[in-house]
């Protein structure tokens, strides 16, 4: 059995601004209990009890998505007895998208991209992520993922489901995984 969505972090290797912000309550609640390293060894112990034998790491808001991807890839390479692939963050609206995806595709464990469309109405309005589905660059980026045989992991709030369905129907070549359906 494969765990299709989990996170790892090492606060000494990769910077996660949202995770390291002390005293900031998020849409999912108080992050204090998870403001510590969560590494593959601990994850595997938890996952094996449930029958998992492989997993997919989903990006978790690193300030440097490439550093996070390279760190996860090094873990995958160092643990061949635990098949581990990953979904990374890449800004699908970026003018450097082709170059960014070219770089990510040099990292062997990468299978797809997650750019969060919806977390909570309040946070999405502040960050502008609630406008991504209206962006032609974002829609083009979704299509480009499929052209490169990369998947898209969709995290959204309920009010965005219909709009997301319309965007995704315009890129039928892109395989999409629905994560945090309805968020969180």
Regions found by a protein language model. Give the residues of each.
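Short aromatic-enriched loop/helix-cap "lid" or pocket-rim segments at secondary-structure transitions
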Residues: 12-19, 98-100, 125-126
């Amino acid at each position: 059995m494969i765990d299709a969505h989990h996170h790892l972090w090492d606060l000494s290797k990769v910077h996660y601004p949202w995770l390291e912000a002390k005293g900031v309550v998020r849409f999912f609640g108080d992050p204090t209990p998870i403001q510590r390293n969560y590494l593959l060894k601990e994850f595997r112990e938890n996952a094996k009890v449930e029958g998992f034998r492989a997993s997919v790491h989903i990006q978790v808001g690193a300030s440097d998505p490439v550093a996070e991807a390279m760190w996860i890839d090094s873990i995958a390479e160092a643990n061949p007895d635990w098949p581990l692939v990953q979904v990374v963050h890449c800004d699908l609206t970026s003018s450097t998208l082709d170059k960014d995806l070219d770089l990510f595709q040099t990292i062997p464990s990468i299978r797809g991209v997650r750019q969060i469309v919806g977390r909570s109405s309040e946070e999405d309005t502040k960050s502008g992520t609630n406008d991504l589905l209206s962006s032609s660059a974002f829609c083009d980026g979704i299509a480009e993922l499929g052209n490169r045989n990369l998947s898209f992991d969709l995290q959204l709030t309920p009010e965005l489901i219909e709009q997301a369905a319309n965007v995704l129907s315009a890129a039928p070549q892109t395989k999409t995984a629905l994560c945090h359906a309805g968020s969180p």
